[in-house]
């Protein structure tokens, strides 16, 4: 009975270790992906967008300032 219990403990510890290693690898992969995305976003800030064209407003047709 003792060998079965020790085998079960070893098996559970192995599963726990495997889970920790996989979660660590996923965390590293996410961190490198986020790091790459951050670098791509910084490149966008190095080159500012050109200014947009001004909005055309036609001259006012009011009679203000034109006399009677």
Swiss-Prot record:
Composition skew (Pro residues), residue ranges: 48-57
Ranges annotated as biased composition (Basic and acidic residues): 37-47
Region (Disordered): 33-68
GO BP terms, alphabetized: defense response to bacterium; response to bacterium; response to cold; response to ethylene; response to jasmonic acid; response to salicylic acid; response to salt stress; response to water deprivation
Top-level taxon of origin: Eukaryota
One annotated Gene Ontology cellular component of this protein: apoplast
Tissues of expression: Mostly expressed in stems and flowers and, to a lower extent, in seedlings shoots, roots, siliques, seeds and leaves.
Chain ranges passing through the membrane: none
UniProt GO molecular function: LRR domain binding; receptor serine/threonine kinase binding
Residue ranges of the motif SCOOP motif: 54-68
Location of the protein in the cell: Cell membrane; Secreted, Extracellular space, Apoplast
Observed phenotype of the null mutant: Slightly increased growth and fresh weight.
Keywords from the UniProt entry: Apoplast, Cell membrane, Cleavage on pair of basic residues, Membrane, Secreted, Signal
Subcellular location, principal: membrane
Residues making up the signal peptide according to the UniProt record: 1-31
Motif SxS motif essential for MIK2 binding: chain residues: 60-62
Induction text: Induced by cold, drought and salt stress, but repressed by pathogenic bacteria Pseudomonas syringae pv. tomato (Pst) DC3000, jasmonate (MeJA), ethylene (ET) and salicylic acid (SA), mainly in shoots.
Family per record: Belongs to the serine rich endogenous peptide (SCOOP) phytocytokine family.
Function: Brassicaceae-specific phytocytokine (plant endogenous peptide released into the apoplast) perceived by MIK2 in a BAK1/SERK3 and SERK4 coreceptors-dependent manner, that modulates various physiological and antimicrobial processes including growth prevention and reactive oxygen species (ROS) response regulation. Promotes the expression of immune-related marker genes (e.g. WRKY30, WRKY33 and CYP81F2) in a MIK2-dependent manner. Inhibits root growth and regulates root meristems. Prevents general growth and development. Exhibits antibacterial effects against Pseudomonas syringae pv.
Record text on subunit structure and interactions: Interacts with MIK2 (via extracellular leucine-rich repeat domain); this interaction triggers the formation of complex between MIK2 and the BAK1/SERK3 and SERK4 coreceptors, and subsequent BAK1 activation by phosphorylation.
Name assigned to this protein: Serine rich endogenous peptide 13
Naturally occurring in which organism (per UniProt): Arabidopsis thaliana
């Amino acid at each position: 009975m003792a060998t079965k219990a020790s085998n079960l403990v070893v098996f559970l510890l192995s599963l726990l270790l495997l889970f920790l290693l996989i979660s660590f690898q996923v965390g590293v992969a996410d961190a490198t992906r986020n790091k790459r995305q951050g670098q791509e976003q910084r490149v966008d800030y190095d080159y500012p967008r050109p200014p947009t064209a001004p909005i055309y407003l036609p001259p006012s047709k009011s009679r203000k300032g034109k006399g009677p």
